[in-house]
Amino acid sequence: NYLIWLATAGLLATSAQAAQAPATVSLASTCPPGFELSAGNQCKLHSLYDQYNSLYSQGVGGLKTALPARRDGFSPQQIDLGRQLFFDPLLSGDQTLSCASCHHPKLGFADGQAKSTGIHGRTASRGAPSLWNMAFLTSFFWDARAKSLEEQMTGPLYAANEMGNTPAQLLS
């Protein structure tokens, strides 16, 4: 589901750019820092957590509980496409906002506001949370209503007061 969406969004962004001016889109063939490329063209995260046994599945709580299993195995091209889409304003309803409009890299991927500003200057109900370590989470949004990153992604994308897009508009 996620890869289909990524591919569709990538094609939409690419076709929109191609309609404006001929351009060559190339995706990275190397992994980001902290990742290692496997023989199967997958980026694997390497961290200090790899050196310790996890207590996550052993029912042990408190400060000694390790992080949950991480999501690994994306190719360098998939990671780079995700990065390009994150900064692409074509995903918003009026093509003026990207994910990075509210999740500023220099602000810890948050916006530093009590309430975020969305499409047409509309005010969101809350501020954008930081995106640090999101790959380790098992629920998303302030009320934990989304159980995956894929499910979470549709929230701000389709919210009328955030990015204000629709599935039909994305495909048009």
Q: Which role fits each region the language model picked out?
A:
Residues 17-172:
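Periplasmic c-type cytochrome electron-transfer domains
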Residues 2-14:
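Bacterial N-terminal signal peptides
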